[in-house]
Amino acid sequence: YEKPSFYGNLKVIGYKPNNSEEETHYILYQNGFTQNTVAKNGESLNTYIHVLNNLSMSSEIGNALVLGFGAGALPNYLESKKYNVDVVEIDPLTLSIATEYFNYKKKKSNIFFEDARTFIKKCKKKYDLIVIDLFFGDGVPEHLTTKEFYRDVKKCMVKDGILLNNTVVDLDKVETLDFVLSTFRSEFKNIYYFFDKEL
């Protein structure tokens, strides 16, 4: 499956692992870059999703905000753990793709099709957990990496809320990591980061 959208080219490829008779896995690409790999049952095969899943359980069960829908694996997971989930996604086409190929089964999630920056700016609700998983191709749009953006994100969180952020950093360029961390530190006291060198 391949279809252009206003926000880039979306492509889904199915494959059987190790040329076996196992169930088909599906990969979601945006503008040629992998966004997620999901088994037929909807379980993500990407390491970072499992890290986010485990870390999210440190939060009180309550309201969760997911910025970036992708293949729908994370919203699916959070719903299964009884979170009240709001999802912000700029590209409406991702929902139909996630439903058809990635076993996304919307139950109670509220999905808002708009730019994450705009949503955060006008946000009135307080969230126990916010997950930022925003990519355009192989990078994050610049307006979603600023101190101002994270200041507004913080305003959408309860006092002891948790923010999980998935981002791509070139580990060969120390200054890039320093920039990302200094941006987080401008608004948040306790920061933990994990690397997945396979990505």
Regions found by a protein language model. Give the residues of each.
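Class I S-adenosyl-L-methionine
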Residues: E2-K3, L171, E175-L199
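Conserved beta-strand signature within the Rossmann-like core of class I S-adenosyl-L-methionine
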Residues: D160-T167
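Class I S-adenosylmethionine
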Residues: Y1-V88, P92-F102
